[in-house]
């Protein structure tokens, strides 16, 4: 199951590289692993993120969105 998710993410990244959305010097597997890691880390630690970031219950997803946007802005054209 995890392999299917990783394969899907890698294919999305490959398409994004092909259409010029992501820098062409990126390795699709590395980008996919990084995105997956950010998402998994969030779900493993969301209670602590809420406490440390002083987010109200249910608004800690803002952290995930900002973390993903920060990473994606560093690899996109």
Locate predicted features.
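C-terminal peripheral helix-coil segments that are non-catalytic and often amphipathic
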Residues: 3-19, 34-77
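Membrane-interface starts of transmembrane alpha-helices
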Residues: 28-32
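Conserved catalytic-loop position in the HRD/HxD motif
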Residues: 25
């Amino acid at each position: 199951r995890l392999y299917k998710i990783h394969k899907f993410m890698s294919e999305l990244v490959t398409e994004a590289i092909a259409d010029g959305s992501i820098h062409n010097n990126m390795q699709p597997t590395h980008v996919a692993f990084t995105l997956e890691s950010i998402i998994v880390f969030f779900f493993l630690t969301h209670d602590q993120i809420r406490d440390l970031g002083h987010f109200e219950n249910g608004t800690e997803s803002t952290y995930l969105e900002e973390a993903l946007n920060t990473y994606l802005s560093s690899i996109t054209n």
